[in-house]
């Protein structure tokens, strides 16, 4: 990593790239000529290894037919568990605590159905007002399924500034009527990293189970679940982990809970040696595999095989080191080049509180995102006024960051954004 003090010059960006320990991984990814892709926090790029593993599993289907469940390089019957083992180091968990299955939202339904047991005065779920909408929809659904009113039984911690959450406020909300807590590890707009260790310890002091949505942290920051004693977690694999659109998601359950009957059981909840006995009494697996429901989506899982190989080689600590350095570099460039254009930095500046993306606020954010795309820079827009820019450690360069800020400066200086409507597209 380049340690010389920040300079806003193009030459400085090139020096940073020259000293980048991860630069060899850039050739692993398909990057479109003439485009700077800064949306890996929404959908990661395709790697050559992910492509290869997808084609390998297609070949297994072609070669083996039904026998692909137990034959070939990656037998499908054991694939979810195998990928759970490969994912476990990224969250600091044991292999048996981790499974690749379902989608983020179905996995939220699974963990809430399993851990939400309203009794006595403990009937409420604690979340926050800045979390991703799908999490809230799932929590509301699960509360209704218990015959309760979400307006009364779903507590959302308020934000003091509309961007971030105070951990003190979250802890203050851990009252005697809270039965369960689900929070984001990293806020999807501002990129704030919550202190999962502290929040877990405070929840457990009060006898409350706590879990986290890792969609914006897994593959970007290290986690230490074995040390932190988190109860459960869910995540998608198509952002920083580059598993592709609709890629199968992930689920973690602390080993101390792996004897719990899944709230949502299905055929693949079974112990492997019992599954084809076809009994009507479930013999659940004694590991995170019990929290699977139906048949694995094999072809939607396949790209993750190749992608996780890359993460094993790169190492999550090195990825975090570069991510912090390149996002800090981008923030410095923005401060130097864009101070005249009414942007507000919406993400935390402190390293320990900043995730993998930059969050800029501007009244013309939707228009600005369209102008960036027209000029070959791929950001994403988040209502009401946010521009997210994610320089991903595996495949983005400092040169790309420098160029993207210069392009943004030109868009603002020449008012290029005014040719676009200030409203989002169908998919922002």
Curated annotation (Swiss-Prot):
SUPFAM superfamilies: PLP-dependent transferases. NCBIfam families: kynureninase (TIGR01814). PANTHER family: KYNURENINASE. Its cofactor is pyridoxal 5'-phosphate. One of its GO terms (cellular component) is cytoplasm. Catalyzes the cleavage of L-kynurenine (L-Kyn) and L-3-hydroxykynurenine (L-3OHKyn) into anthranilic acid (AA) and 3-hydroxyanthranilic acid (3-OHAA), respectively. Its EC number is 3.7.1.3. Keywords: Hydrolase, Pyridine nucleotide biosynthesis, Pyridoxal phosphate. The gene is kynU. This is Kynureninase. Pathway: Amino-acid degradation; L-kynurenine degradation; L-alanine and anthranilate from L-kynurenine: step 1/1; Cofactor biosynthesis; NAD(+) biosynthesis; quinolinate from L-kynurenine: step 2/3. Pyridoxal 5'-phosphate binds at residues 104-105, 132-135, 213, 216, 238, 267, 295. The modification N6-(pyridoxal phosphate)lysine is found at residue 239.
């Amino acid at each position: 990593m380049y340690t010389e003090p920040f300079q806003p010059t193009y030459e400085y960006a090139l020096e940073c790239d020259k000293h980048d320990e991860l630069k060899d991984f850039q050739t692993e990814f398909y990057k479109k000529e003439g485009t700077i892709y800064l949306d890996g926090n929404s959908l990661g790029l395709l790697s050559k290894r992910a492509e290869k593993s997808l084609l390998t599993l297609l070949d297994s289907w072609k070669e083996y037919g039904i026998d692909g469940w137990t034959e070939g390089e990656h037998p499908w019957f054991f694939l979810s568990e195998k990928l759970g083992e490969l994912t476990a180091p990224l969250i600091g968990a044991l292999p048996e605590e981790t499974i690749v299955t379902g989608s983020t939202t179905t996995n939220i339904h699974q963990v809430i159905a399993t851990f939400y047991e309203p009794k006595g005065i403990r009937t409420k779920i604690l979340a926050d007002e800045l979390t991703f909408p799908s999490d809230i929809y799932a929590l509301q659904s699960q509360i209704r399924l218990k015959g309760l009113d979400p307006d009364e039984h779903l507590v959302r911690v308020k934000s003091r500034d509309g961007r971030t959450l105070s951990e003190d406020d979250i802890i203050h909300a851990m009252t005697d009527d809270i039965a369960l807590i689900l929070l984001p590890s990293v806020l999807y707009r501002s990129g704030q990293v919550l202190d999962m260790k502290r929040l877990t310890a405070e929840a457990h002091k009060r006898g409350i189970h706590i879990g986290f949505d890792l969609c914006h942290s897994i593959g970007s920051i290290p986690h230490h679940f074995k040390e932190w004693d988190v109860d459960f977690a869910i995540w998608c694999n198509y952002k920083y982990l580059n598993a592709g659109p609709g890629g199968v998601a992930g689920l973690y359950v602390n080993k101390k809970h792996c004897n719990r009957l899944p709230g949502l059981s299905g055929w693949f909840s079974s112990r492997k040696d019992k599954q084809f006995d076809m009994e009507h009494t479930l013999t659940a697996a004694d590991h995170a595999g019990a929290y699977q429901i139906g048949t694995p989506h094999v072809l939607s899982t396949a790209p993750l095989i190749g992608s996780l190989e890359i993460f094993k080689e790169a190492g999550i600590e090195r990825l975090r080191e570069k991510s912090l350095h390149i996002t800090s570099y981008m923030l410095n460039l923005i401060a130097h080049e864009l101070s005249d254009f009414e942007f507000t930095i919406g993400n935390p500046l402190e390293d320990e509180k900043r995730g993998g993306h930059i969050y800029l606020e501007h009244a013309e954010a939707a228009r600005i995102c369209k102008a960036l795309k027209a000029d070959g820079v791929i950001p994403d827009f988040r209502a009401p006024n946010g521009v997210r820019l994610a320089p991903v450690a595996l495949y983005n360069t400092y040169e790309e960051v420098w160029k993207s800020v210069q392009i943004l400066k030109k868009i603002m200086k020449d008012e290029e954004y005014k040719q676009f409507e200030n409203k989002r597209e169908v998919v922002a």
